[in-house]
Structure formats: structure tokens, C-alpha cells
Amino acid sequence: TVTATHAGKSATCTVTQSAGEITYGAWKVTITANPTTIAAAGGTSTLTYSAVRDVLTNGVVTSTEKATPTVSGSATGFTRSGATVTAANNTSASSRSVTYTATHGGKSATCTVTQSAGSKQYGSWSAWTVSVSANPTTIARTGGTSTITASATRTRTWTWNGVSGSGGTESEKGTPALSASGSGFTLSGTTLT
């Protein structure tokens, strides 16, 4: 209210300002992962996500409003607890990935976490184990034959990505060379006469 006064007389007038208008900008949603690639043997990645929008007074940005978006997404081999993504040992020769989506106020954003392909890690071969047997083990005095059976095997252990307990054992077979000694015997292939 403005008052004008002169010679004992006065007059007033009032100026009114309209109420301020509060409006909001669109939500801006972001989500990132660090790291974006996890080793084949397993590990973790941390998600960072947020939702922000401008608050405007009479069309002028005066502050921002923040919120926590909803995060969704799943894939085999991955688990999420809050912002922590855990990848299990990848027992596959292919890489794998999971995509997470952060959503709030009708807006969304995505990020992808990838796990490297798995590979088999081998130990050293064991020494060869050689066995030989004859059937029969006794030949009549009049002569006859015996069949010789021989084998050679060796083993080694393996794991996926060096993670203990994730693999197994494999074996390899060989063919031993046969020879015979002793008077009165001949060996042809696996037949002893």
C-alpha cells in the first residue's frame, strides 16, 4: 500500500503481486557400474544411481529435488544386493552380462555389467601308470598261447579360471610297447606263444 500525503490530506493505493508459481522439470535418471567388466573367476561391481529434477519458481530454477530410483534386472550368474553386483565363477567358455534399469517418475536409464569368458586351467600330468596281465598265466607243457593285455594311463586335474573345486580330473590313455623275454616264447602282437 502506498500513501500520498499533502496539506493534511492523504490518499492510498495498493499494489498486489501474484502468488509465485512452483513448477518442476522432468526427472533425469542415471545409473552406472564400476567396474563394467568382472573377471571370469568372479567378483563385484558397484552401481551408482540417482534421479534429479529441477524446481522452478516463476520459471527460474531455484533448487533441485532428488529421489532414489527403482533398480531392476537379473541374469544367470549374477546377484544384486543393494548397489553391489556379484558375479559367480563363470564355468562357461562364453562371456555373459546383465543389464540393470533404474526407473523413476516415468524416466529410466540402463547400464550393463559384463563378465569375461571362463577358461579351463590345467595342472600337470601325473606319471604314467602301466599295467600288464596275461590270460592264462600258465601254458601247458605241450605248448599253447596266452593273451597279453596292457594299458597305460595318466591323469591331470583342471579348474574353471583357477577356482578350487570348480573342475575335475581327466585321463589320457597310451599304448605300451610289449616285449617278451625267456627261452621258448615268442610274442606276436598281444599273443604270447
Q: What is the predicted role of each segment?
A:
Residues 12-16, 20-21, 25-70, 118, ...:
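Solvent-exposed, low-complexity, repeat-rich "mucin-like" stalks and linkers
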Residues 1-8, 94-106:
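A short beta-strand micro-motif common to beta-rich folds, especially ectodomain repeats
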Residues 8-13, 106-112:
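Extracellular and select intracellular beta-sandwich modules with Ser/Thr-enriched
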Residues 68-83, 139, 167-192:
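Low-complexity "stalk/linker" and mucin-like segments enriched in Ser/Thr/Pro/Ala/Gly
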Residues 1, 82-97, 191-193:
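Extracellular/luminal low-complexity segments enriched in Ser/Thr/Pro
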Residues 1-27, 188-193:
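Low-complexity/repetitive intrinsically disordered segments
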Residues 6, 17, 89, 104, ...:
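Residues on the solvent-exposed faces and adjacent turns
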